[in-house]
Amino acid sequence: LDVAAPDAGEQAVGTAVEAFGAIDLVVNNAAIEADARVGEGRRDAFERVLRTNLVAPWALSAAAVGPMRRQTRAGRRPGAIVNVGSAVGLFGRAGRAAEASSKAGLIGLTRTLALELADARIACNAIVPFAGTRAIRAIGDADGALAAFRDRTATLAASHVAHLVAFLAAPQAAGISGQLFGVRGREVFAWTQARPAASCFQPRAFDADEFAQALRGLRRDFADLADDVEAFGDDPVS
């Protein structure tokens, strides 16, 4: 199934309902990459990544929410949606604009679905996985921090991620929605929602000099310009 095809979402949902009679879990996991720096890559390659990594999860979720709502009203336990993101979507990485853009959008979609489905008690959460997948092994030739990141992550079993996905669909996870989790071997962590870290104000509009002065006062709260490789350069709990 080409998840980026226009009718793929409806086709997948129809097949699942026909085979199992209901939909208890939707996992948006399919993803592709197109490594290129901005200004060097092709637009069609960038758009292909967005269609697979972001539009396809939207389409599959859109096709599934109707049946999931109806079966919940009929008395079935509410289902769940789990979106699989990436640390690149949170931190960025040079040469990975397409993945970063699509996976950052997936986090916004996760929050929005959680809000829209709260009345039906259908949960939607996202997971940022660190595991020895084909994508990690495909990094290939690398040196320095990227090589160390690849080698550390390659030791982590993907089953750790699968166990959390299964839990988020279980009755014990009732009430957990709109959250972003990370799985790195035997370590599970929750990301905070982005919120203002500091602020400043004045009675009138800021001019350029006043902006400069105000932002100097906020500088201690600026986010570090570190990519995911730098942020997770320590040894995982494998």
Provide a role label for each language-model segment.
Residues 37-47:
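Substrate-binding pocket helix/loop in short-chain dehydrogenase/reductase
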Residues 15-26, 34, 75, 123:
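A glycine-rich helix->loop->beta "capping" turn
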Residues 91, 107, 112-122, 171-174:
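Active-site-adjacent segment of SDR/Rossmann-fold oxidoreductases
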Residues 1-11, 43:
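The beta1-alpha1 cofactor-binding region of Rossmann-like NAD(H)/NADP(H)-dependent oxidoreductases
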Residues 86:
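Residue(s) in the substrate-gating loop at a strand-loop-helix junction
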Residues 61, 102, 110:
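Active-site helix of classical SDR
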Residues 126, 147-238:
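C-terminal helical subdomain
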